[in-house]
A protein has these predicted regions:
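Rossmann-like NAD(P)-binding element
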Residues: 37-44, 59-120, 128-129
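NAD(P)-dependent Rossmann-like dehydrogenase/reductase catalytic/cofactor-binding core
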Residues: 2-4, 183, 189-190, 213, ...
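NAD(P)+-binding Rossmann beta1-loop-alpha1 motif at the extreme N-terminus of oxidoreductases
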Residues: 1-56
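Rossmann-like dinucleotide-binding cores of NAD(P)H-dependent redox enzymes
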Residues: 34-67, 162-167, 194-200
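Structural/interface elements that position substrates and couple domains in central-metabolism enzymes
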Residues: 30, 183-184, 197-200, 204
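Rossmann-fold dinucleotide-binding core
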Residues: 122-190, 194-197
Length: 322
């Protein structure tokens, strides 16, 4: 299978992380710094990126997660600041510059004349929508958002955001590329915060409110997340867990919390209300958010429990939890 040449614009933490994700799977990567800098400043940025690549690869070798030498993997990543010599002959470009619409639009306008019509360009933004970004390109149908989670070379998930104007082939090619480097892509409509940042922002805000209110210490809040919610969510998706616990549990919990806090964020979602009216509360009724027709519920729970117990064994190998 042909190995596309990967271009990543922006040598910061995300750019380096994405470069490593591809280099670890033997892709040639061009990491490009297009910010206007003096020669001395560019050299400093280049050396910092090289050091970040090298230190990460040495770490992976120390813990036995590197099949090839750090030098061999590191040689897959070239760092430059010369746009003209590339002409982006590669098939994929990842934009990973700071989270400012003006900077991203200026970059897209700058590189647009250099792109082939089949070149796919993906912004790594976690907040800016495609409607804003597409104004910078001559062929916006090839523009996607790929939202990676730090550290990009470890976390499997990559969210792919698209609009109705996005070329379906561009989405399919991006999904295929990401799967080749061991990622788990999910496709969604262009929406503020996508999936993870939107859910994560609410969870982080609520944890901060608990701390502000003196409900628990920072250490105990984090311990509760790591050994409770976070531990469980490594096996259950959120919607899947609603089903497994029973939609009625969430329904009554929301009613109580809404009554206690008088806050709209705890109001029962309309979908949950509809499911309750229809008696669709999860596996025990054959349907909840998911359909369980023909599925043996006991086996489903046992499968999840087995995975949780394997994770528990890994945690116990890590020594004391406090």
């Amino acid at each position: 299978m042909e190995r596309e040449h990967i271009f990543i614009i922006g040598p910061g933490r995300m750019g380096v992380g994405i470069a490593l994700a591809f280099a670890l799977h033997h892709f040639e990567v061009n990491l490009i710094d297009l910010k206007a800098r003096s020669a001395e400043e560019y050299e400093r940025v280049r050396k910092k990126a090289e050091q970040d690549v090298g230190s990460t690869l040495n770490f992976l070798r120390r813990i036995g997660r590197l099949k090839n030498s750090p030098e061999e993997i590191g040689s897959k990543i070239s760092i430059s600041h010369d746009l003209d010599k590339h002409h982006f002959e590669g098939s994929f470009i990842f934009e990973a510059i700071p989270e400012r619409p003006d900077l991203k639009l200026a970059l897209l306008r700058r590189i647009s004349p250099c792109l082939r019509q089949d070149t796919i360009i993906a912004s790594t933004t976690s907040t800016i929508d495609l409607k804003t970004l597409k104004a910078g390109l001559t062929h916006p149908a090839k523009l996607l958002i790929t939202h990676w989670l730090n550290p990009a070379f470890i976390i499997p998930l990559v969210e792919i955001a698209r609009t109705e104007e996005t070329d379906a082939d561009a989405v399919d090619r991006m999904k295929a590329l990401l799967k080749r480097i061991g990622k788990v892509p999910v496709v969604l409509k262009d929406s503020p915060g996508f999936i993870i940042p939107r859910i994560q922002a609410l969870a982080m805000n609520e944890a901060t409110h608990l701390l502000e209110e003196g409900v628990a210490t920072a250490e105990d809040i984090d311990t509760a997340i790591k050994y409770g919610l976070g531990f469980r969510l490594s096996v259950f998706g959120l919607l899947e867990f609603i089903d497994m616990g029973g939609l009625d549990i969430l329904y009554y919990a929301d009613e109580f919390l809404y009554s206690a806090f008088k806050n709209e964020k705890f109001k029962v979602p309309k979908l949950i209300e509809e499911k309750m009216k229809n008696g669709e509360v999860g596996p025990r009724t054959g349907k909840g958010i998911y359909d369980y027709d023909g599925i043996k519920v006991e086996s489903l729970f046992e499968e999840k429990y087995e995975k949780l117990l394997k994770l528990l064994s890994l945690l116990e190998q890590g020594g004391p939890r406090s």
